[in-house]
């Protein structure tokens, strides 16, 4: 009987078995003892978790249920299991042992855990409604009575427009401005929608007035007319170098009928020595950026502005946004102080200032107060545009051309890169469907990254190239020339969305490129007659008239509604059709659709919505129903291929990280009125990193330094060449004392650190390089 009682005592449940653990906890602080007791109690209440040991130990040493286990003074911590793939808890530790010190990478799925759009059903029904094609609002006038000769232009100039420039009729804004500027000498404010011909609207009256002065002088004094040394009569100011170049090209085309009138440019990025030589020879019309003109007015004695009678401020709102208010005020003050009565007959007694802007914002009104006096507001006649009366509220509004077809796509942040690729694949699938397209992104680093992604070569292509490198070298050079490959690295074949029947050339443009590279790239894109794409920042969003642009893609939304309207204004110009697509993310960004609708006179009835899944199906799956099954696999395979490409090369990986960080900084610079729709706190940084081909956690994405501006690079170069103060150089060019080299290096390092610190306080605004 006693033995039976002992057996019953040993068969008592586990609570009595683990009781001795309470008495065995000794040593340490009271916090350690308390935590050890809690762990022991937790293990007692959850006996199943005791089986988390390896399978090998369980099979070799079966546990004895009658054995009493006594824990040590400190209980052993349980291993944290982070197993997303279901392959066991030992896999993460094995990966860490294989790659010691490397940041942990995570390969997530493209089509899992993506947020859904908020208003999917309502917008889909609205997009399904049929809308009639709108009548173009910025096309040349059809009425035969509205010719250039009837507006007051001379017969030679009108004939030159018709025969050489193939401009048959004026637009509505050209009709209103030419009539006003030729009739009166008062200041004027020209306001018109994008793509309506504002450049010709103020250039034609200027050229006509100077031609009239020259003709009158020739009649009075035989054999003499206006020459390049007669004086500077007109100055045109533009915010960007590209716009100045374009204005100069248009002006040069107009002056072919009056070769005695000479025009020139002074812009940033060019050699001041060459500009001073042109100014010494003499110019009649000068196109300039505000900063460079202010510099020449201060330092160049050959620049005589005493005869300037016309001053044009093109894109006035952009001039103020880029911070040229101080320079403009100084230029106007110097022009007023240096103005003198002219000896040439026919020149007006006072200066006429013309301000051109698409909007009447507060900054434009402030610029008008600085430069204009009793100005006349010139707008296109509503009857000339669409025959409908304009409401009072719409007088000052900046509208989109009616023939422009705007659409938007709600795309999750993880799917942005593959969706853009699929859309471009579908766009250039057939030859001749789209000739030219522009992709707008937020910052220069993002331009460089996407350019490398879209022009990279696949593995199969690289193998074929290595095999036939020697035999087909000449053929490859011919193909590069056909596609316009550039020695500057800004033009390359777009392998991501090209096909054998329709090759596409990709161009990149941003403000960090040298000026001659920017000019060459923009000229190559404009002259290219083959399908081509330009990926750029807002440096190409204002005033540029690029021919045959059929499509504008806003991959990153603009920083303001006005910038958005200027971006999409690169297409649908002078009555031509055009399309525009903007990428928005699910959530708060969907509220931006209401702003898109405000840009249309009809309230955005023609605004359509594209589904991200439909874009991916058409780009990676095709039209056949059987092919639509594996479009997700093809999209995933393409994304993983890009990620592997970035991981294999440190330069590409650093480029992706720079683009990711610059994109986040640019995202935080939206104007205050739209910041609720572009809230940086709502961004899923991990999903966003996926769209930049990154597998690292957002907290582990670090970049050694920011992009250096051009000015900083020049300063560093000059500082390296300067000798140390107080030391003489030998004949060979070396310093007498070798100890000066570390001292100079320390000075340069301190200067670089100071510049980096200043850039951090400036919130990274310098890397956008818009001007």
Swiss-Prot record:
A motif (Q motif) lies at residues 146-175. SMART domains: DEXDc, DUF4217, HELICc. Residues 53-69 have a biased composition (Polar residues). GO terms for biological process: endonucleolytic cleavage in ITS1 upstream of 5.8S rRNA from tricistronic rRNA transcript (SSU-rRNA, 5.8S rRNA, LSU-rRNA). Residues 179-378 form the Helicase ATP-binding domain. It catalyses: ATP + H2O = ADP + phosphate + H(+). PROSITE patterns: HELICASE_ATP_BIND_1, HELICASE_CTER, Q_MOTIF. A motif (DEAD box) lies at residues 314-317. Residues 23-35, 119-135, 712-723 have a biased composition (Basic and acidic residues). InterPro entries: DEAD/DEAH_box_helicase_dom (IPR011545), Helicase_ATP-bd (IPR014001), Helicase_C-like (IPR001650), P-loop_NTPase (IPR027417), SPB4-like_CTE (IPR025313). One of its GO terms (molecular function) is ATP hydrolysis activity. Residues 460-476 have a biased composition (Acidic residues). It is found in: Nucleus, Nucleolus. ATP binds at residues 192-199. Residues 90-105 have a biased composition (Low complexity). Residues 403-615 form the Helicase C-terminal domain. Its EC number is 3.6.4.13. CDD domains: DEADc_DDX31 (cd17949), SF2_C_DEAD (cd18787). Residues 23-139, 458-485, 703-771 are annotated as: Disordered. Keywords: ATP-binding, Helicase, Hydrolase, Nucleotide-binding, Nucleus, Ribosome biogenesis, RNA-binding, rRNA processing. Present with 1460 molecules/cell in log phase SD medium. ATP-binding RNA helicase involved in the biogenesis of 60S ribosomal subunits and is required for the normal formation of 25S and 5.8S rRNAs. Belongs to the DEAD box helicase family. DDX31/DBP7 subfamily. This is ATP-dependent RNA helicase dbp7. It comes from Aspergillus niger (strain ATCC MYA-4892 / CBS 513.88 / FGSC A1513).
